[in-house]
């Protein structure tokens, strides 16, 4: 029987080669030691420079990527990719650490609850913000732009007029503001309510339309530096309207309304503060009289402007005649003047 020694030698060589490879593979397989760890032959790792952490073992033969807590769908990886694999019963979490499977499930549940809670909180906050936009508190200090309030002024106060009187929300009305400086205009934003309007301009049934102080831009311009009798009439009305000819603030009924309400802050809003050098926009005095007020608002100054109680108003009174002075007696007495026109010594 003839045997081809060449083929035989080749077969023996192949057999020996595969046997050697098989033994090498068996030696490289990890052996399970204590729970949570693996005893690994680090021979291959020495060649690759890879060192596995706790609960991991080295793997260079898998085709798929291992499972992760947030991704259970295996994806194809590069063949023979060399990396560390989580031990049996462990899974890699979002921090790339191998944890027990039950810990992974708990972590996912907590994340779901956190996300749901966060979504609910965001939804509640958005709802709360929306409600604030339409709440009474958020619209009750809108400095008098609502149409219903404008209608109360006998149909002649429009948006432009309100802006002239009280300033726009962004306080850009300082230039043509007839009564206030920009600082005072800012004070009006959010604090002018219906009661204040009634005190300053009268109620709708008082027919203030004819003598309304600031209806048009032209009238507003008149106030700048030219306070005269005509301007005062525009502001305070004429005698036939029972305003005591040039009575600066009130009829008897209106004077009663002011008692206990008009304080220093209100006077500042109406007439301006002393440091504003009252000359240009002051509704009661000429420039000379305005100069008297700067820093010297006291009892003597008030007497010069409004007269003394003992009917000696005629000599020094800048706005009224003796007849008008008599009209004041019994309405504005010393006590009332203190309440209405009192200023702290400046």
Swiss-Prot record:
Transmembrane segments: none
CDD domains: TIL
Swiss-Prot/TrEMBL GO biological process terms: symbiont-mediated suppression of host innate immune response
Keyword set includes Signal: yes
Keywords associated with the record: Host-virus interaction, Inhibition of host innate immune response by virus, Signal, Viral immunoevasion
Function: Counteracts the host humoral immune response by inhibiting the processing and the amidolytic activity of host PAP1 and PAP3. Thereby, melanization of host hemolymph, normally producing several reactive intermediates toxic for viruses, is deregulated and proper immune response cannot occur.
Protein name: Protease inhibitor Egf1.5b
Organism: Microplitis demolitor bracovirus (isolate Webb)
């Amino acid at each position: 029987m003839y045997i081809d020694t060449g083929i035989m030698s080749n077969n023996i060589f192949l057999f020996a080669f595969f046997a050697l490879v098989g033994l090498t593979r068996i030696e490289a397989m990890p052996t399970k030691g204590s729970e949570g760890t693996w005893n690994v032959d680090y021979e291959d790792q020495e060649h690759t420079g890879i060192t596995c952490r706790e609960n991991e073992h080295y793997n260079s033969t898998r085709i798929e990527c291992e499972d992760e807590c947030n991704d259970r769908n295996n994806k194809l990886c590069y063949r023979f990719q060399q990396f560390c694999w989580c031990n049996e019963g462990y899974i890699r979490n979002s921090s790339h650490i191998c944890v027990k499977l039950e810990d992974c499930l708990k972590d996912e549940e907590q994340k779901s609850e956190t996300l749901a809670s966060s979504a609910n909180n965001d939804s509640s906050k958005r709802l709360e913000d929306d409600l604030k936009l339409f709440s009474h508190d958020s619209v009750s200090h809108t400095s008098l732009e609502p149409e219903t309030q404008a209608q109360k002024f006998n149909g002649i106060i429009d948006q432009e007029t309100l802006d002239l009187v009280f300033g726009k929300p962004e306080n850009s009305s300082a230039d043509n503001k007839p009564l206030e400086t920009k600082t005072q205009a800012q004070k009006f934003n959010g604090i002018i309510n219906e009661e204040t309007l009634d005190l300053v301009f009268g109620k709708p049934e008082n027919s203030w339309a004819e003598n309304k102080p600031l209806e048009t831009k032209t009238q507003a311009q008149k106030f700048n530096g030219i306070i005269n009798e005509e301007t005062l009439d525009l502001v305070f009305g004429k005698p036939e309207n029972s305003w005591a000819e040039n009575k600066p603030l009130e009829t008897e009924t209106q004077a009663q309304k002011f008692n206990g309400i008009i304080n220093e802050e209100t006077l500042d809003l109406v007439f301006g503060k002393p440091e504003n050098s009252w000359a240009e926009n002051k509704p009661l005095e000429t420039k000379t009289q305005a100069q008297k007020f700067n820093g010297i608002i006291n009892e003597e100054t008030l007497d010069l402007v409004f007269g003394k109680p003992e009917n000696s108003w005629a000599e020094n009174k800048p706005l009224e005649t003796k007849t008008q002075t008599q009209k004041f007696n019994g309405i504005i007495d010393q006590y009332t003047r203190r309440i209405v026109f009192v200023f702290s010594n400046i």
